[in-house]
Each structure stands twice: as C-alpha cells, then as structure tokens.
Design a protein with these regions (language model features):
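Outer-membrane beta-barrel architecture
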Residues: 1, 13-15, 62, 165-167, ...
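Short coil turns and loop connectors of transmembrane beta-barrels in diderm outer membranes
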Residues: 4-8, 20, 171-172, 262-266
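Transmembrane beta-strands of outer-membrane beta-barrel proteins
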Residues: 10-12, 164, 170, 175-177, ...
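Conserved small-residue
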Residues: 3-154
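Transmembrane beta-strands of outer-membrane beta-barrel pores
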Residues: 16-22, 170-172, 181-185, 253, ...
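Residues that define the transmembrane beta-barrel architecture of outer-membrane proteins
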Residues: 8, 158-162, 247-252
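Outer-membrane beta-barrel domain signature
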Residues: 151-155, 242-245
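Extracytoplasmic gating/loop element in the C-terminal half of outer-membrane beta-barrel translocons
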Residues: 109-111, 124-133, 137, 182-268
Length: 268
C-alpha cells in the first residue's frame, strides 16, 4: 500500500505462504525403501517416512537428561530406599514400567536399562547404561532403548513463511528495507551435536565444562566417552536434545539514499 502526505510517502509490501503435507497412504515396499537403517552408533539423521506425519519430519529419541548414579549404587539399596531414591527425583539406569514402578527379575533385583541394537543382518549389541550416560525415553517401558523408541520430533517445514518490506520517502531522502521470515519449523542442530560430542579432535562447546564427572552430579551434559569401542557415540545419538525452533526474522537489506539535485550533479 502507498501513503502520501506532503513531501512524505510510504510504500509497504508483505507476502506469506504455508506448505503443508501429510502422508496418508503409501505402498509398504516404497516405505521400506525410503527409510534408512538404524545403526548401533547412529549419529546420522534418520531418513524416515511414516504415515500421518509430514514428509521432511525429524525422527529420533526423546532426551530426558543424564543418569546421576550408577546402577550398582541403586541396586545396593533396600527396596524402601530404592523407592525413596526415585521419589526424590534422583536418576539411575533402572527400568521402570508405565506406572513408574521398578521392573524386577525373578530374584527381585531391579532390571538394568540397556541400549539394545539388532538388525536384519543378525548384528546385535547390548550396552549397560552407567552414571553420566544420556537418558533416552523408554517409550514402550521394556527397559531396552532401541529402534522401537525412535519417535517423531517435529517437522522441518515452517507453518508460515514469507517476507515484508517498506520504502519511505521524504523530500529527496529514501529509506528502503526488506525482511524475510519463517515461523514454526524445527531444525536439527548438528553443529551443536558435534561441539558437545567430546569424541573428536574438533573444538568443543563451552557447555562440555558442565558435563557429568562423578556420581550425584546434576547436569544436562553427559559424561565424556572414549572414542574406542562400539558405543563411543552413544551420548550424542539423534534426539530432541539437538532439535531446536527454526523460527527466524532476517533483514535482507537496508538502503538509505539521497537524490541529489540536478544543479548539484552538474557541478561535480
């Protein structure tokens, strides 16, 4: 729109759009072809397509923090002390059912939470969680963290995208600006994942100074793991720990100009 009054005038523009999609039906064979395999050291972005979710969605584990204590510390407590331990908000790698109750074996011992990997090539690995390890939500409450616990974490598609701008004129002066924006999308911050991994020679984020170091530490940054072994990458699995809001407002350009009088130009 244009506004004019005396020597002043203003011109505004705005645009917006929404791209929404949902996968309602797809041949099972095609679905399997599109979905990448889950690996035991999965730090790669899973390409996954699921019905009733949008194409371009992010999938991974739900991150719930860091285990404060080792399993052995918890297991050595009496049953009453164990219940009090959990009621106080402390965490240890112990399997809980849907009601938050401790899952026990035939001997009455608490079941230890494990990271369990297996695939169609008959490869199988188990890892016993320890104090300082990342806590991933056990979706089906079986005490095993595996591919069945991978869930939808959000869409990379924005709910709204577009731009706006204006041109302001006063006498011979002009101010011109243009912005673009995106609202409601999720991004997977792989730069942050690498900077908090503590398994490479790359520079690390200041956040790793607050990592778990000893039993009882309360922090959101897991312990440092050795780069050797099958589970060196466990604490930086793809999860909502690294999923962030992708909303932004960006200034594309800002111009200030002055239209010199013709007489002045001729003198130059």
């Amino acid at each position: 729109g244009i506004i004019k009054t005396g020597k002043f005038s203003a011109d505004f523009n705005v645009s917006f759009g929404n791209n929404k999609n949902e996968i309602l039906e797809m041949d099972a064979t095609v679905l399997n072809m599109l979905n990448t395999k889950f690996t035991q050291e999965n730090r790669n972005v899973l390409q996954r397509v699921q019905l009733n979710n949008p194409f371009g969605a992010i999938y991974g584990f739900r991150y719930k923090g860091v285990y404060q204590y080792n399993y052995e510390t918890f297991a050595d407590l009496t049953v009453a002390e164990q219940e009090q331990f959990l009621a106080s908000g402390k965490t240890a790698p112990v399997a809980l059912n849907a009601n938050g109750e401790i899952i026990r074996n035939s001997k009455g011992e608490p079941k230890r939470t494990k990271y369990c990997f297996s695939n169609s090539e008959n490869e199988s690995k188990d890892y016993d969680f320890k104090g300082g390890d990342a806590i991933y939500e056990d979706i089906n409450n079986d005490g095993n963290i595996n591919e069945l616990d991978i869930v939808y974490l959000g869409s990379s598609l924005p709910k709204l995208t577009g731009g706006f701008g204006f041109t302001l004129n006063y006498d011979r002066w002009r101010l011109n600006a243009q912005f673009n924006y995106r609202v409601g999308n999720k991004i997977l911050n792989l730069a942050r994942l690498d900077a908090e991994s503590m398994i490479t020679n790359n520079n690390q984020s200041q956040a790793v100074n607050y990592r778990w170091r000893k039993e009882g530490d309360f922090t959101s940054i897991p312990r440092a793991l050795s780069t050797s072994g099958n589970f060196a990458n466990y604490n930086t699995m793809i999860s909502d720990r690294f999923v962030e809001d992708g909303t932004f407002l960006r200034l594309n350009y800002l111009q200030i100009s002055y239209n010199m009088p013709q007489k002045m130009v001729k003198k130059i």
